[in-house]
């Protein structure tokens, strides 16, 4: 069998399907369960180098948008095109047997929130990326069982909005208004390699061969610099997991001072805190996202003590310094504190304080810059694709920052600035066409009326701006959405947790974001717009099976094929799972039987398939009763 090199990006839950496809889910569940019980793991390499794990790594890597990024050897995922599965597996098993990573390509990207400053990024070669993916697939379930509940960065099913919700809950419910901001100076560049490997050992990862390989990864030569003696290579697949392992010790040290403090008497949750308040212990809670963390305290005195204690602990235990300029104590009743692009504070409401949030000034500046840069691109390449890229940026910004209570006002401010650039740079492109006086539509007759625009932004006033026949999403069109706390039961390594993931994780926005970013070239503007509208209309589900669609497994079908006179109209399109689409067009009996066996359709679904087959001028499928 030839290794598949179909290069598409996948949503989060597709990795669950990949794991099930290669029979690795049960293995991961077992590792998680045993790690929860405190077991140590001495023989992990046989799992890491297993055939199924290597093939799963390839499947996960090839669907990542970075799969076409070259390392120092100039190769991408396409180098494996045409390889058999056996050849591919044996190649990587031999690499593991005597592993020596290639050098890492160094590049620089703008810092988040500081576009004028750059941060280094190390890009491993493709072979090394697959090896790191093999390792992380086995290590992640072990580490997830040991990580603290209130660490949210680079972890499955957790996001920045969960961290924001946690911080605001501590301000609202627990009434903790003194925030300790600790900024670790150059965290990723200063991680102690020896300490990290000892932390992995303490976490139960005790396979010496694996520890040796990770040591080699940490000391991979950086192009033009040499071999590092400290730090984790930013840009590597395994780096986020390693950074969480380093700071997990800090998480539990902080937590054990109050939140998870053990007591002689087995109190219930609420009674335990009441008892602790009567002691001399200091009350505080923390929330962490990667190396960005907040410690929320009851009063300034406690905050000052915690600030000093954390500073000393980081230096003595991890050899890390804090940045004096960026580390501080903030009273959020008087001043805002920045966290993950949000500015958090509290305001008086009656007799109590209520948490509020805005987009931080740094984040607003970054968004203005990015939008203006894309407008410059459109000025030189006025194509529907580039305008859709702008729309994808706007939608992505709205989806991230809509949990800020002041997001509407903030985006109106951004819109005011960016609209000037839009007007001056694209004034010729947005010139109004003549409109039928009898028409009630705010759009010129020659402009395509976008269903996508109507579904997401139709309730907003104002005349839509149109460039290259595509309506630009209104930058000001963002409404507040209450951030939700993370549900601990959601877990990709338990059957019950996976059910919650499939039930609760809405994929519609991620699918639409993907469709906006990946136009089908050679297709009409009408088709590219209607397929996006249709995705929202079908709520991201297959029209036949009702199952949730994913990027790796979905196709847009013309009910009446274009060769038979069909159009790109909304009513002539339908989103289907790939296997359903193949069944509709199948004419050979063996092929039909194959997909019927895969799909196992009920009578209702088969009726829908036959309706679509007849529209495509194919014969109905008749299933004979046994």
Predicted segments with their positions:
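Non-catalytic, polymerase-adjacent accessory regions of viral genome-replication enzymes
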Residues: 1-86
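Conserved polymerase palm-domain catalytic core
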Residues: 88, 96, 103, 108, ...
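Histidine-centered nuclease catalytic patch
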Residues: 183, 546-578, 584-592
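A conserved non-catalytic segment of reverse transcriptases
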Residues: 219, 224, 318-388, 392-395
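Non-catalytic, peripheral interaction segments enriched in hydrophobic/basic residues
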Residues: 382, 386-449
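Extended C-terminal regions of large enzymes
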Residues: 424-522, 600
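Short cysteine-rich loop/turn motifs with clustered Cys
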Residues: 524-555, 577-579
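Polybasic, low-complexity binding patches
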Residues: 563-571, 583-624
């Amino acid at each position: 069998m030839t290794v598949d090199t179909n290069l598409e990006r996948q949503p989060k839950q597709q990795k669950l399907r990949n794991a099930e496809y290669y029979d690795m889910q049960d293995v991961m569940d077992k590792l998680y369960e045993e790690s929860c019980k405190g077991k140590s793991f001495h023989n992990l390499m046989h799992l890491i180098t297993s055939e199924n794990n290597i093939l799963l790594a390839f499947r996960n890597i090839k669907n990542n948008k970075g799969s076409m990024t070259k390392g120092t050897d100039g190769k991408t995922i396409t180098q494996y095109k045409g390889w058999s599965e056996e050849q591919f597996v044996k190649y990587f098993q031999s690499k593991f047997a005597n592993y020596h990573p290639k050098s890492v390509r160094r590049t620089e990207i703008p810092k988040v929130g500081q576009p004028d400053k750059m941060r280094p990024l190390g890009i491993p070669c493709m072979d090394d990326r697959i090896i790191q993916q093999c390792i992380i697939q086995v290590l992640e379930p072990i580490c997830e069982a040991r990580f603290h509940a209130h660490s949210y960065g680079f972890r499955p099913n957790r996001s920045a909005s969960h961290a924001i919700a946690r911080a605001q809950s501590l301000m609202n419910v627990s009434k903790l208004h003194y925030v300790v901001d600790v900024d670790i100076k150059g965290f990723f560049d200063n991680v102690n390699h020896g300490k990290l490997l000892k932390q992995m050992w303490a976490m139960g990862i005790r396979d010496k061969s694996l520890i040796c390989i990770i040591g080699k990864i940490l000391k991979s030569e950086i192009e033009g610099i040499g071999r590092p003696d400290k730090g984790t290579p930013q840009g590597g697949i395994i780096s986020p997991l390693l950074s969480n392992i380093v700071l997990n010790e800090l998480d539990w040290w902080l937590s054990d001072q109050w939140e998870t403090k053990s007591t002689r008497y087995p109190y219930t949750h609420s009674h335990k805190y009441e008892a602790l308040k009567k002691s001399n212990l200091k009350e505080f809670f923390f929330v962490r996202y990667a190396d960005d963390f907040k410690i929320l305290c009851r009063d300034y005195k406690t905050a000052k003590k915690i600030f000093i204690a954390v500073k000393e602990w980081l230096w003595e235990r991890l050899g890390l310094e804090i940045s004096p300029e960026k580390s501080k104590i903030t009273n959020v009743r008087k001043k805002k504190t920045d966290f993950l692009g949000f500015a958090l504070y509290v305001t008086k409401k009656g007799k109590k304080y209520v948490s509020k949030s805005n987009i931080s000034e740094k984040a607003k500046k970054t968004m203005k810059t990015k939008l203006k840069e894309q407008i410059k691109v459109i000025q030189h390449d006025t194509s529907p694709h580039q305008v859709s890229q702008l729309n994808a940026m706007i939608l992505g910004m709205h989806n991230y920052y809509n949990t800020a209570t002041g997001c509407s006002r903030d985006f109106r401010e951004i819109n005011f600035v960016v609209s000037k650039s839009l007007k001056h740079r694209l004034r010729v492109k947005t010139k109004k066409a003549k409109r039928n006086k009898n028409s009630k539509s705010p759009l010129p007759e020659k402009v395509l009326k976008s269903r996508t625009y109507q579904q997401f932004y139709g309730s907003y006033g104002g005349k839509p701006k149109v460039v290259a026949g595509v309506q630009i999403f209104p930058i000001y069109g963002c409404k507040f959405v209450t951030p939700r706390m993370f549900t601990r039961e959601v877990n990709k390594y338990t059957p019950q947790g996976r059910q919650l993931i499939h039930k609760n994780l809405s994929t519609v926005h991620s699918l639409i974001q993907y469709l906006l970013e990946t136009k089908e070239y050679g297709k009409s503007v009408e088709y590219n717009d209607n397929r996006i509208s249709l995705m929202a209309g079908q709520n991201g589900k297959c029209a036949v099976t009702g199952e949730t669609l994913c990027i790796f497994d979905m196709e847009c079908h013309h009910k009446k094929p274009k060769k038979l006179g069909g159009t790109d109209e909304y009513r002539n399109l339908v989103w289907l799972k790939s296997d359903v689409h193949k069944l509709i067009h199948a004419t050979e009996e063996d092929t039909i039987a194959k997909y019927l066996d895969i799909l196992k359709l009920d009578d209702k679904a088969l009726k829908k398939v036959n309706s679509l087959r007849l529209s495509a001028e194919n014969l109905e499928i008749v299933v004979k009763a046994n």
